[in-house]
């Protein structure tokens, strides 16, 4: 099946457009309700920060108030940010050139992800 839509969900340590990313999740879908291949990888927080990702105190405090299960994101062995970005690019390229991205508002997930790629160019 040919999927043209990909829903993106980032877990970040900030809310600005250069927020440090700790996970990238995505699922391909169509408007008939079919779900396609998924993607989920965690990023080593220090790697994202070392390469320009910004943390903010209010987001760190928010994460500290979340459930044990939600905070387990920080216990996973994340990969270097550029490695996850390469893996995610490969995932996206598997769908062809005409992909529509969906995220949590036009100014959050999509912008943060685009800025992360820009930092690595």
Summary of predicted features, one role per range:
Residues 2-104:
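Conserved non-catalytic scaffold segment of RNase H-like nuclease domains
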Residues 92-93, 107-121:
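Substrate-recognition/cap helix-loop segment adjacent to the acidic, metal-dependent catalytic center
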């Amino acid at each position: 099946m040919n999927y043209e839509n990909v829903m993106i969900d980032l877990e970040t340590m900030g809310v600005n457009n250069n927020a440090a990313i700790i996970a990238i999740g995505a699922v391909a879908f169509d408007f008939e309700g079919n779900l396609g291949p998924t993607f989920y990888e965690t990023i080593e927080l220090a790697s994202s920060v070392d390469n320009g990702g910004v943390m903010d105190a209010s987001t760190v405090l928010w994460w500290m108030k979340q459930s044990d299960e939600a905070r387990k994101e920080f216990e996973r062995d994340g990969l270097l940010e550029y490695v996850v970005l390469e893996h995610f690019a490969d995932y996206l390229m598997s769908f062809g050139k005409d992909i529509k991205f969906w995220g949590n508002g036009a100014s959050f997930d999509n912008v943060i992800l685009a800025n992360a790629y820009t930092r690595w160019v």
